[in-house]
Every structure is written in C-alpha cells, then in structure tokens.
Amino acid sequence: MTWPAFIDHQRTQPYYQQLIAFVNQERQVGKVIYPPKEDVFNAFKTTPLEQVRVVLIGQDPYHGPDQAHGLCFSVKRGVKAPPSLANMYKELVNDIPGFHIPNHGDLTQWAEQGILMLNTVLTVEQGQAHSHANAGWEIFTTEALKLLNAQERPIIFVLWGSHAIKKGAVITAPQHQILSGPHPSPLSAYRGFFGCGHFSKVNQLLMARGEAPIQWQI
C-alpha cells in the first residue's frame, strides 16, 4: 500500500465523496479555504508511507492568510511562527543541544526525514477555526492512522493534547511507541509541554533501533 493508493481507495467511499463535494462547494461560493487545493495532501506527498518513522498529529489547519500548507504546525516561509510553533521552538532549545530558533516556520525538512505531519482535519475556512470539523476528514485521517498501525515496522506517534491523544486511540499494535503530553499552545504549554523532552526522546528511540536521528534544526 502507498499513500496514493490509500487516497484513491478513500475516494471511492461515500463519506469522502460527500466531504469533497462540501469542500468544493465552499470554494465555489467564494469562501477562502485553507490550505490551497494543491497543498491539502502535502503531508502524504512529502512523507511516503514506507518512509514514515514518526507521526505528529495536529488538529486543523491554520486559518490565517498564507499560513497553512498541508503540514501540521508548519507555516510557509515569510510568515511569523504561530504561538504553538514558537513554543515548540522554545522546547527544542531546551531539549536539543545547539538548537537555535529558526527565522521561519516551514517544517518541510522534518517531513522529508520521515515525520508525517498530520492534521486531523485537512481544510478550514479563513478565520473560522474548526469550521470543517465533522465534515468527514476525521474518518479519512483515522483510516490513515489505522493503516499506519498495521505497518510491521515500529513507528513513533507523538500526541500533544487531548484531541491528539483521543485520535491516537487507534494505535494499538505493540511494535509502535507513543509519546503523549500537553499541547504546545500557550493555554497548556506550561502544564507539561515545556520540559517534556519529546524531541530528544524521539531520537533516542530511533537510534536505539539503529536509525538515523531526526535533524531538528531547520
């Protein structure tokens, strides 16, 4: 199985046809929908299924201009890092020796190293957080997680916040490893995201099985 084959199969399902009809209709009536159509599946394009080593679960795309480009927590170059990403950078400074805060928020290099940067919902209306919740994306992304759960090789799942932890309930196979904790948003970062050490823990787990660590510096 590959991501393109997975997506093609989902496209045959009634829920998906309703979902895409809804998203296309929203675009057609003139609503601004993020990310742009060509970026909706960026996470799957950038990190092929057979290369996934780590999964990072976000919620829905950023809903401001030029932010979302299909990778959770990531923003296009030239756009200020949103608060959650800024807090991730702060934790990286404390957790990874020598890490310095980048002057951008584009996490594509993480995705290219095998981190699937997966939002639970893949589209959103401009300025309306969670506006496409319950339209069908949750089914799509749960099916993607079930496929990841079925992979024989071990995968590390990083679940920040109650939303991601609930979403990760489908990860049941014993070969996988789960790191969970509070979300990096300003509302919860001080409840245990700061100091969680998840970035170095990911690398410890990868190196323990003979794999290259993630180069977090971007």
UniProtKB/Swiss-Prot annotation:
Disulfide bonds: none annotated. The keyword Transcription regulation does not apply. Keywords: Cytoplasm, DNA damage, DNA repair, Hydrolase. InterPro entries: UDG_fam1, Ura-DNA_Glyclase_AS, Uracil-DNA_glycosylase-like, Uracil-DNA_glycosylase-like_sf. GO terms for molecular function: uracil DNA N-glycosylase activity. The active site is at 60 (proton acceptor). The keyword Methyltransferase does not apply. It catalyses: Hydrolyzes single-stranded DNA or mismatched double-stranded DNA and polynucleotides, releasing free uracil. GO terms for biological process: base-excision repair, AP site formation via deaminated base removal. Its EC number is 3.2.2.27. It comes from the Bacteria. SUPFAM superfamilies: Uracil-DNA glycosylase-like (SSF52141). One of its GO terms (cellular component) is cytoplasm. It is found in: Cytoplasm. Pfam families: UDG. Belongs to the uracil-DNA glycosylase (UDG) superfamily. UNG family. Excises uracil residues from the DNA which can arise as a result of misincorporation of dUMP residues by DNA polymerase or due to deamination of cytosine. This is Uracil-DNA glycosylase. It comes from Shewanella oneidensis (strain ATCC 700550 / JCM 31522 / CIP 106686 / LMG 19005 / NCIMB 14063 / MR-1). The lineage of its organism: Bacteria, Pseudomonadati, Pseudomonadota, Gammaproteobacteria, Alteromonadales. The gene is ung.
